[in-house]
């Protein structure tokens, strides 16, 4: 089985700021991390590989050349190789254009199962995974928080919605999107890091390699654009009380009722 995990390099949201004049994210000097939902997807793929050693795991991303470092992290964790889509033509792609490029790359690389994170923390659209499945014309299951069973023919997963859990069995090939809460990603392994130093395991593809019409990707191929980005202003307000235990309990209960957190 061949599993391709889609990843995105995103700015660390704990240190992100916004240019108030342009409304754009300030990325200069901000540490880049692997999107958390995507890391969970990689861990899920590696757990399948742990049980079925013949499984091949490939990490794939579209981005700037520096995104290769993220792919190397994935290989160091246990993936077999990384694939980087990088080209100026691809710059400025929205989710629609991104899915076109990723679908073309997936067709070129080959796959049985595609795992993507539910959404990226720098956009929160949750669109790329489903759109890529649509481009490929294959089934998709989103919001997966557990892989129950997988074989050469199908995969069975559990997905959690607001008030219900669903068990879904779907034929391969397919796309699933994963939640960061589903597992704890493993650390990079020393042996894998040494192997990376000996052998280049990152393949780079340009738009020419993909054979995609340049007018369908990048700014030209993007029907949507971000008008503005902003961060919510948070103000801290602290009040100090010196009360007895009973008075404290009464005050907490009153406050919770006022905020309609409790009703009785």
Q: Where are the predicted features?
A:
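N-terminal glycine-rich FAD/FM-binding segment characteristic of electron-transfer flavoproteins
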Residues: 1-264
């Amino acid at each position: 089985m061949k599993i391709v995990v889609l990843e995105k390099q995103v700015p660390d949201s704990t240190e992100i700021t916004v240019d108030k004049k342009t409304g754009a994210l300030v990325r200069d000097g901000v540490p880049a991390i692997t999107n958390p939902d995507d890391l969970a997807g990689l861990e899920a793929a590696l757990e399948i590989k742990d049980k079925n050693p013949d499984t091949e795991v490939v990490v794939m991303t579209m981005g700037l050349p520096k995104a290769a470092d993220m792919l190397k992290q994935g290989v160091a964790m246990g993936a077999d190789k990384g694939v980087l889509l990088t080209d100026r033509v691809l710059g400025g792609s929205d989710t629609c254009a991104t899915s076109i490029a990723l679908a073309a790359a997936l067709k070129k690389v080959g796959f049985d199962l595609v795992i993507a994170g539910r959404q990226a923390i720098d956009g929160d659209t949750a669109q790329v995974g489903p759109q890529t499945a649509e481009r490929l014309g294959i089934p998709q299951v989103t919001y997966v928080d557990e892989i129950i069973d997988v074989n050469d023919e199908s995969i069975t997963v559990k997905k959690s919605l607001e008030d219900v859990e669903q068990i879904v069995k779907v034929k391969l090939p397919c796309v699933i999107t994963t939640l960061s809460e589903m597992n704890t990603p493993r650390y990079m392994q020393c042996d894998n890091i040494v192997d990376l130093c000996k052998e280049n395991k990152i393949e780079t593809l340009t738009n020419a390699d993909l054979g995609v019409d340049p007018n369908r990707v990048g700014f030209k191929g993007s029907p949507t654009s971000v008008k503005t980005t902003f961060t919510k202003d948070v103000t801290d307000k602290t009040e100090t009380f010196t009360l007895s235990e009973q008075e404290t309990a009464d005050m907490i209960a009153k406050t919770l009722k006022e905020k309609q957190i409790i009703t009785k």
